[in-house]
Amino acid sequence: MEIQQTHRKINRPLVSLALVGALVSITPQQSHAAFFTTVIIPAIVGGIATGTAVGTVSGLLGWGLKQAEEANKTPDKPDKVWRIQAGKGFNEFPNKEYDLYKSLLSSKIDGGWDWGNAATHYWIKGGQWNKLEVDMKDAVGTYKLSGLRNFTGGDLDVNMQKATLRLGQFNGNSFTSYKDSADRTTRVDFNAKNILIDNFLEINNRVGSGAGRKASSTVLTLQASEGITSSKNAEISLYDGATLNLASNSVKLNGNVWMGRLQYVGAYLAPSYSTINTSKVTGEVNFNHLTVGDHNAAQAGIIASNKTHIGTLDLWQSAGLNIIAPPEGGYKDKPNNTPSQSGAKNDKQESSQNNSNTQVINPPNSTQKTEVQPTQVIDGPFAGGKDTVVNIDRINTKADGTIKVGGFKASLTTNAAHLNIGKGGVNLSNQASGRTLLVENLTGNITVDGPLRVNNQVGGYALAGSSANFEFKAGVDTKNGTATFNNDISLGRFVNLKVDAHTANFKGIDTGNGGFNTLDFSGVTNKVNINKLITASTNVAVKNFNINELIVKTNGVSVGEYTHFSEDIGSQSRINTVRLETGTRSIFSGGVKFKSGEKLVIDEFYYSPWNYFDARNIKNVEITRKFASSTPENPWGTSKLMFNNLTLGQNAVMDYSQFSNLTIQGDFINNQGTINYLVRGGKVATLNVGNAAAMMFNNDIDSATGFYKPLIKINSAQDLIKNTEHVLLKAKIIGYGNVSTGTNGISNVNLEEQFKERLALYNNNNRMDTCVVRNTDDIKACGMAIGNQSMVNNPDNYKYLIGKAWKNIGISKTANGSKISVYYLGNSTPTENGGNTTNLPTNTTNNARFASYALIKNAPFAHSATPNLVAINQHDFGTIESVFELANRSKDIDTLYANSGAQGRDLLQTLLIDSHDAGYARTMIDATSANEITKQLNTATTTLNNIASLEHKTSSLQTLSLSNAMILNSRLVNLSRRHTNNIDSFAKRLQALKDQRFASLESAAEVLYQFAPKYEKPTNVWANAIGGASLNNGGNASLYGTSAGVDAYLNGQVEAIVGGFGSYGYSSFNNQANSLNSGANNTNFGVYSRIFANQHEFDFEAQGALGSDQSSLNFKSALLRDLNQSYNYLAYSAATRASYGYDFAFFRNALVLKPSVGVSYNHLGSTNFKSNSTNKVALSNGSSSQHLFNASANVEARYYYGDTSYFYMNAGVLQEFANFGSSNAVSLNTFKVNATRNPLNTHARVMMGGELKLAKEVFLNLGVVYLHNLISNIGHFASNLGMRYSF
């Protein structure tokens, strides 16, 4: 029975033929961002004419399953709907395989021969205007659909949610359509548990040869609750007008997916459009191989999930792939603000208004029928979510020999947060007229891990007029994308690279394989970072850049082929190293030139013959480290180095000769750099400055000779032509300035004289113009410099020069406002009374004469008597003061003594000089301010004094001993009980005393207490957990452990308590700066007793303690790092105590007040330190021993309640009245730390505690104690929690 169904609207595919027209205007040479902004994104985000919000969750689902309707198109209506339901049996055999077509579909699908296309095709029974719905939702098993080729419509909807669908097991399937006046769309939907594609699958193909009827559009929807998989041999082909919707947990397509495939001759004359929608795939979508285009300008779109992976992407030379990632948070629901309103309003004076606020008003009595179309909501482009990723292992383009003016462009466009191209890189197939590949991420980043190839060759080349072009654009819309290339890029001749981004990062770029390349980075708005750039005749369009190394080759073609930086480079551009490689000869020279810029900083510049550097259009160029020839030993060619304004930075070095061929058309500033003039043929080349020159110097001295650091050095000056003026520098105006004194000016005679002292002539490494003689070795060196063999062979004959500076009057110097020059007459010879000498200043010791090892870089002169000679300190060389003085920081010596004292000074001497040398000391103080030095020294001396202190070393033993003193006092209080509430015990004692006579006159209670045993079970075993801490300004120490003992009450001729104990505690210490950390294992053991004589109590105690300490020093600063080490030592103590007290009893002995006095002896000590450090400042020695004699006074209150419970408090003062001992100073190389101790200490102590009965014969006790040193302000705190068992 045929089932009729009310006509309803059927959505059409996103990329339908109507949309094709909108896309035709997009030529391959245009940016494919238009595909997003004008077609794809409005269609997805805004919905199309039906009013369906396709960019929303519900709208996208509707589009994914039924597709969006073509704009303003009357909906298709099926003439007839057939329905088939899988009946009994299909839901019973989950392992059975069925032929889907034979089992269910064949009864409602007809087939026949298409004479126009010479092929068989299939359609829904009754014609392509009908629909077949198959209800298999309860069916199980596997259903094969194989050989359903050329299915031309109408619609097919198969619901088999619990079953597996296998497409193409033995033969492929194709779902297509026939084009007619209605442009009818074929829609095929499969909903299964799993979908397996085993053979070819075609969508919207032409039937047969394709010469007959065209296809309209086809939508194939595959839904699988678990997964969709295709085999390696299963090729999926999407023809023009095809849409494939995939909805599943995961999609893995192992075979080739071909979008925009051709089927008939001539199809390449028009572009094709196809779409794959994977937005409803929750996991990763994996395309093993994706091909876009088939000799045609195919345009393909993938509506992507969060993560898309493509193994190999093949793009035809004019094809475009657009991968659209979902926005942050996915597609959201939009309110349905569009009514489905299509009827006409004919009521008099009635109006209708839709939700788009458009009001239609019908005039009175009008018979006109007005149809209100749905509102179309169109949103703009959006960025992919922050976790959206498109990964492509390799991109290939394919090309043929077609020639087109401007060439062809293939494109890949996405909006994902990250577009990653893997190790396979990018291959561009190039042909005549040129080919271009555009890779753009509209809103995110691009990363390329592999190489760029042309015709499968790294460094592949193209021909003139047929260039190969790579284009990468990151963050086109956001202007905040980063393009990163993690592999070296090698570009052959006529191969170009264009990158647009906010920031571009390159590992390396090599265009030196023949040149004629363009690197267009003008679209990078922030910074271009290149590790290594090799160029030859390359056009480099870049604004602000940071190039680690620039190597400029000559291309070997003709004169004038430069690497051209064709954009304004701005003011932030920098090149760490420039290397101009040697050209062949003048006709094959090359070079680099710049269009314009504010400033270029170059750290190192190495020039070579026949390679030019033209920076005349850059306002300022600064050389910060080195300016030299890369071929100084073989200067057979000439260079041409051209600048506008050039600055030689501080401590930079310029090697200059006639081969440099340096042109400065503006100003030259030598800002405390050094110019080395090389003598060639007896001459030096003149450095000509077009405008003004500034020679800025300082008061630093040369590290090797002790002279002022030269600003100009003439090497091999002995080869200069004699009796000739040698002009070193000429300018319209020359100014001089001393930055150390802050003076500068033009025509300043004093500054000119100072500058001349910084113009030095050398014979090898020996100064010619002045000799400083401190010993006979200096006499020999002077003789070698001036060519005086007598001074070399017989230095003793010239001892009169020792302690003097001798000036070579055969050399004269000129430094004025227009030139700097030297005039060489020949070397003069020193004589004993010939003058031309200046006495060197001295100090109180002869050590001042031997300064060579202390003359470290940047050390300025400190004595005005010889401003051109070596500095002589007021302090002995080899002292830390001399290093400060040479560093022109004499005031810091006073700061050091004022803030750190002699101990801090001695420690600095030990750390920097005694353990290293003056050179190391100079390096360290140059890097550290005076305030920081004193701060670090104070930290170190405080820590070292703490280490040496015997109080610190025995602190944990004292805390452990204090814990035990509290426990022992608690035991004595417990056993000294006179009060009982136990009536049974009292009655038993009375019975035992029956018929006894006593001589005493005390009360009955006193008699009972005196002659009664303290307990029925007088022997006790006890154990306590203990914890303690030592608190002071230098740090915090903590201790935890356990203590145990046994005691008993003895009732013989003498009434007494005797006991013994042992304890263990682990202690740790950290000072406030965390530079000292310690851990120690400690033991304590001893005996105690109390003797009773009526209300008199005599206490005696003896104990010993031993601790093994492991400590480490951990200073963070570089200045103190040599102190860092681990070390160990032993600490020990021994003590005896005796005291007397008298009990005052109240409330029938329940409350007892006991004052007491006592004396004690303590012996404290430690062994030498043993360090694991191999540095010269390893800790050693440090043993200490101290004997202490103390007197104490205490008051104790006890309260007894019940039969066993009690509480007590004890407070008192302990005063040392004598001490003596010895200590071995802690040694760190030459630095000593002597232990210091307060003469006589006073301690205050308070402790309290008590005991509760838990069960018969089992008791719980606890207590706390605090001891405070009133002199050193150190506190010790301890507590215990313990158990006692009585037996």
From Swiss-Prot:
InterPro entries: Autotransporte_beta, Autotransporte_beta_dom_sf, OM_autotransptr_brl_dom, Vacuolating_cytotoxin
Signal peptide: 1-33
Positions of the Autotransporter domain: 1014-1287
Gene Ontology molecular function: any one: toxin activity
One Gene Ontology term, aspect cellular component: periplasmic space
UniProt keyword terms in alphabetical order: Cell outer membrane, Membrane, Periplasm, Secreted, Signal, Toxin, Transmembrane, Transmembrane beta strand, Virulence
Polar residues bias (residue ranges): 351-376
Any Pfam family the entry gives: VacA
Chain intervals for the UniProt region annotation (Disordered): 326-381
Domain notes: The signal peptide, cleaved at the inner membrane, guides the autotransporter protein to the periplasmic space. Then, insertion of the C-terminal translocator domain in the outer membrane forms a hydrophilic pore for the translocation of the passenger domain to the bacterial cell surface, with subsequent cleavage.
Role played: Induces vacuolation of eukaryotic cells. Causes ulceration and gastric lesions.
Protein name: Vacuolating cytotoxin autotransporter
Source organism: Helicobacter pylori (Campylobacter pylori)
